Amino acid sequence: MFGVLNSNDHRAAVQQRNIPAFGRTSFEPWTDNPTSNYRCETGGNGRDSGQNRVRRPMNAFMVWSRDQRRKVALENPQMQNSEISKQLGYQWKMLTEAEKWPFFEEAQRLQAMHREKYPDYKYRPRRKALPQKSDKLLPAASSSMLCRQVLVDEKWYPFTYRDSCSRAAHSRMEDQLSSSQPVNIANWLLQQEHHYRSTSLRDSPETLAAHLSADPPFYPKEQLGLSDAYFP
């Protein structure tokens, strides 16, 4: 019994030693030392996931803004990072060449160290993700929907002709549409659709056929800008 208890205590002690401390990360933390910029990142996203990725060496602006960004953030804790970057960019442009020169020298030194440590390094920018194409179909044009609703055909329209009057009105409309006289069909269809919606749904099929068989407006070919090539 004592042997079992001792083995359990030993396992618990080993597991407790293997548990990392809270807040401790697996990579080297950032410091104010410029050489810390050369560390490798692990666990990156994208194509570098699971592989070590080498960071680019800092340029002169990054060397200068490293301390300036911390100073501005302490003075303005409510300012967003994008606004801080804009302010630092404006301040950097206002510096003279003599004031910028020490930071250019430091950047050249860091680049030389980077080349010595990573001689085969090549900068490979990450590709921007392409927007995914939507599979949703675009809504149909109102004119095509209108034509499907207004066309009076025994195959499409839900009612049948009960008397000779409604059938004659239907044949009359077909003769007018197929005649050689040019007609502004689009405007006529819009007028008929508006009139159809204004009527009650309780109207009989004969009444609807009478409304649809109204004479369409006549427009001469010169007004429409059409030639005889479109009409026989």
Swiss-Prot record:
PROSITE patterns, alphabetized: HMG_BOX_2
Region (Disordered): 24-53
Record-linked Gene3D superfamilies: High mobility group box domain
Major subcellular location class: nucleus
Quaternary assembly: Interacts with CALM, EP300, HDAC3, KPNB1, ZNF208 isoform KRAB-O, PARP1, SLC9A3R2 and WT1. The interaction with EP300 modulates its DNA-binding activity. The interaction with KPNB1 is sensitive to dissociation by Ran in the GTP-bound form. Interaction with PARP1 impaired its DNA-binding activity.
Family: Belongs to the SRY family.
Protein name from the UniProt record: Sex-determining region Y protein
